[in-house]
Amino acid sequence: MSIQIFNTLKREKEPFKPLKDGEVKMYVCGPTVYNYIHIGNARPIIVFDTVRRYFTYRGYDVKFVSNFTDVDDKLIRAANELKLTVPEVADRFIGAYFDDVDQLNVAKATVNPRVTENMDEIIQLISTLIEKGYAYESAGDVYFRTKKFKDYGKLSGQELSELQHGARVEYNERKQDELDFTLWKAAKPGEIFWESPFGNGRPGWHIECSALAKKYLGDTIDIHAGGQDLVFPHHEDEIAQSEAATGKTFANYWMHNAFLNIDGEKMSKSLGNFITLHDVLKDNDPNVIRFFMLSVHYRKPITLNDAILEDAKNGLERLMIAYQNIDHRIQTDDGEYVEEAHEDEWLEQLTELKQAFEDDMDDDFNTANAITTFHELAKRANIYLAKETVSINVLREFLSMMRLFAEVLGLKLENTQTDSLDDSEVEALIEERLQARNERNFARADEIRDILKEKNIILEDTAQGTRFRRG
């Protein structure tokens, strides 16, 4: 089965066919860095990082570009409020962005271009649109002639006639038509600006991504992605600008994730439920946040609340415990294995589970189903561990497959909690407990068992000695 992608442009799933065999060119719209990103912004970051990981797993060389908008009205306001320059504000929150997403185990992009470091390419693209008659200057601003681009609306499914009197169109007397949108903004007194053939100013939001995608990935890219709120007008305008300038298809596949809601309501400052990722990470394990984000298919809305996060924590812990128990058994019982009679049957089951996981991910990156398959793998691992005799080959294959699934999903299976006990600490307590029992100090022996139980360490006294497992 080939990878199937739901293409917003076609409104259906399509088999993925790259522009170049073995290569994926992918652009994801990045944040405007005037503050910490909100928790909703984390969803596309995690989702499309996972998409990238799966392409890599399938053998593709992925060129992944995600930008920083480091100059716009919000940054200018933030700079005034913080009594900093615009570059200082951008530097502060780009640093904060990396601090936060690194905790979520998000892989580094091939490049994270900043708008302010690519102004020549932006100005050149605007100049090309003017030369081709798709843009015009007006009182220091530059606007795109929307009606001249005949395919406008093809991504969002909107007709120009419907947009003519739409609520999202803002009247501006400098425009030749109310549907035209800004490519270049004339500088206001005291604001940061760049020199250009059209006068001092700065770029509009939409032209930035068109110019950056073209510079780093070429005229046509494989996949353009972002949140569903970007379909219109941002991505619609990107298509118009890029295809008007080059005469080529801008992106073959468009992917959009659905919203994250807080207790069933869309997050917004007006509702008072606006939460930054930075604040969420203060009180929650980033590994759990990532697991939570992937527990629902990316095109379905996802709700965040304490109960759902607790469910995610419990689900992730089941995977971690199974992994750690297998790893511990391999590390400590290497001399006790026998050739298990049904080894081939178990290895065949593992092969089937790997195929099921790939089928889940091939189906428009269905991480929700992939996690269900992951849990089935953990369940069978626990069943196998309970057998009297086991095969080292099967145990190692279980461990390898759990690592593989975790790598694709970007999850960490090792226990990273600071209050947990590593294997050597557990072994030391078991030895102390044995000594206490030999000395008939049963109160201390029971106390040690209770300490371990609080850490989810289960002791099993056998004829060969005391074993432990995490449960």
Curated annotation (Swiss-Prot):
ATP binds at K269. It comes from the Bacteria. InterPro entries: Cys-tRNA-ligase, Cys-tRNA-synt_Ia_DALR, Cys-tRNA/MSH_ligase, Rossmann-like_a/b/a_fold, tRNA-synt_1_cat_dom, tRNAsynth_Ia_anticodon-bd. A motif ('KMSKS' region) lies at residues 266-270. It is an enzyme of class 6 (ligase). Its main location: cytoplasm. Its cofactor is Zn(2+). Keywords: Aminoacyl-tRNA synthetase, ATP-binding, Cytoplasm, Ligase, Metal-binding, Nucleotide-binding, Protein biosynthesis, Zinc. One of its GO terms (biological process) is cysteinyl-tRNA aminoacylation. Gene3D superfamilies: Cysteine-tRNA ligase, C-terminal anti-codon recognition domain, HUPs. A motif ('HIGH' region) lies at residues 31-41. GO terms for molecular function: ATP binding; cysteine-tRNA ligase activity; zinc ion binding. Coiled coil: none annotated. It is found in: Cytoplasm. The keyword rRNA-binding does not apply. It catalyses: tRNA(Cys) + L-cysteine + ATP = L-cysteinyl-tRNA(Cys) + AMP + diphosphate. The keyword rRNA processing does not apply. Its EC number is 6.1.1.16. Zn(2+) binds at C29, C209, H234, E238. Binds 1 zinc ion per subunit. CDD domains: CysRS_core. Pfam families: DALR_2 (PF09190), tRNA-synt_1e (PF01406). GO terms for cellular component: cytosol. Monomer. Belongs to the class-I aminoacyl-tRNA synthetase family. This is Cysteine--tRNA ligase. It comes from Listeria monocytogenes serotype 4a (strain HCC23). The gene is cysS.
